[in-house]
A protein has these predicted regions:
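Alpha-helical interface subdomain recognition
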Residues: 1-141
Length: 141
């Protein structure tokens, strides 16, 4: 997920109450998932900086790009689902609908996230490249 999406959800969770009157942000699962999402964003950033550094140095890199892409797209997919789950049924409201949390961005990202595991090479291909390049495992196909 992008940091603006995390920020938008945090704002929503701080100012929205569950049906029992407790703010969403007071739910320990919500807090843990927000922290995990932020940590994953920083891990993605580290992967990207490392890959960019290797490219700038002219170093031939192999699996670093695949690792960056795989981690980023799989994290985005996971976190987008988390945000929908944490918002409840309202999280499924479309972009622009009046009652949609975060202006409907949760649904927008949830529907877009699976595509990121396909373009630039599917997650399966990335896993195979990492298995071959980093672990020395034989090709699967």
């Amino acid at each position: 997920p992008s940091p603006p999406l995390i920020d938008a959800f945090l704002e929503y969770a701080q100012h929205t109450e569950r049906p029992d009157g407790v703010p969403i942000i007071d739910d320990p699962v919500v807090r843990e998932r927000l922290v995990r999402a932020l940590i994953d964003v920083e891990v993605c950033r580290g992967f990207a900086y490392n890959t960019a550094f290797l490219a700038a140095e002219g170093t031939m890199f192999g699996v670093e790009g695949s690792m960056t892409k795989l981690f980023a797209s799989e994290s985005y997919k996971k976190h987008s689902k988390w945000f929908i789950d944490m918002a409840g049924s309202e999280g499924l409201l479309y972009l622009g609908e009046d009652e949609a949390p975060v202006g409907g961005l949760l649904d927008e990202h949830f529907r877009h996230a699976p595509v990121t595991t396909i373009y630039g090479g599917t997650s399966e291909i990335s896993r195979n490249l990492i298995a071959e390049g980093l672990l020395g495992l034989p090709r699967t196909r």
